[in-house]
Amino acid sequence: MNDWTALTVTTTTEAIEAVSNILMEAGAVGIQIKDAADFKKETVDAHGTWFDPKTVPHLASGAQVIGYFDPATSLVEQRDHIATRVRGLAQFGLDPGAATVTLADVRQADWANVWKQYYHPLRVSRFLTIVPKWEHYTPQQAGELQLTLDPGMAFGTGTHPTTQLMLSLLESVIRGGETMIDVGTGSGILAIAAERLGVGDILATDVDEIAVRNAEANIKLNPVSHITVIANDLLKGITLSADLIVANILAEVLVPLIPQVRPRLKAHGHFLLAGIIANKATLIIRTLEDNGFSIAQRREAGGWVALDAVIKETA
């Protein structure tokens, strides 16, 4: 009997996280990502590398997201539905690519441990280093902060430009002791990083129960104790106010979120947004301005945009 069924979606770099979420919602217990773009970049940038590309067989183009499922899961029936959802990402401005879906049986040893040899600590910003949970790591300089994560989980492990942009914005605005709401927390990486950087109480929300469980698992791997994770749809029903509100989600989800943020953000607070494809930035900025915000910072990387929005000062 085979230990796992692997469902592979052929897609594009920009759709990786969205496809990962689709597979997790379908019941995947683990996610593997193969992205040709990782091997087109320099192997070591200013902040190091998460894995050793020289040792990894890799794609020449495009990307593959592989979900690992219990063999008892009926994927033959789900395959067409998953393909339809992936193709539907186009309506959110994401290129789904070929959106082909294939199935294969694999043994436990083929994926559960072998892939770990390729993952190493990754310096993602001035102060933050992401470390896979099985690695022992000693900080390399004063002030360096370690974020321990399980990169086998979906919902963001720090390698995507949107996550790194958001982490750099957090470093730029945190002064210590703030309250924060993390909308669409995913892996919990932003909440964990924020507390490590000095934020006080943090409420992390996600509409997906699987993401909530993943965030809780990652939080337990880190020396943090002021993060509460709940399942919730954006800010609906949230009554508390915060100094920082962060959201690394698709532009189409940011648009309805923006009006919800204004009454929840304290005066002189910061609303940090990422997950914005460059061609959607104008839409998001216009929506922010229409809701009483101005742009304090704009950062870009890899075709993605992150924004630091503040409440407009009145004359």
Swiss-Prot record:
Report the enzyme's class at the first EC level: transferase
MF-aspect GO terms: protein-lysine N-methyltransferase activity
Give the organism, scientific name: Lacticaseibacillus paracasei (strain ATCC 334 / BCRC 17002 / CCUG 31169 / CIP 107868 / KCTC 3260 / NRRL B-441) (Lactobacillus paracasei)
Q: Per the similarity annotation, which family is this?
A: Belongs to the methyltransferase superfamily. PrmA family.
What protein name is recorded for this chain?
Ribosomal protein L11 methyltransferase
What PANTHER family does this protein map onto? ELECTRON TRANSFER FLAVOPROTEIN BETA SUBUNIT LYSINE METHYLTRANSFERASE
SUPFAM superfamilies the record matches: S-adenosyl-L-methionine-dependent methyltransferases
Q: Where in the cell is it found?
A: Cytoplasm
Pfam entry (one)? PrmA
Q: Does the keyword Transferase apply?
A: yes
Report the protein's function. Methylates ribosomal protein L11.
A GO BP entry is: methylation
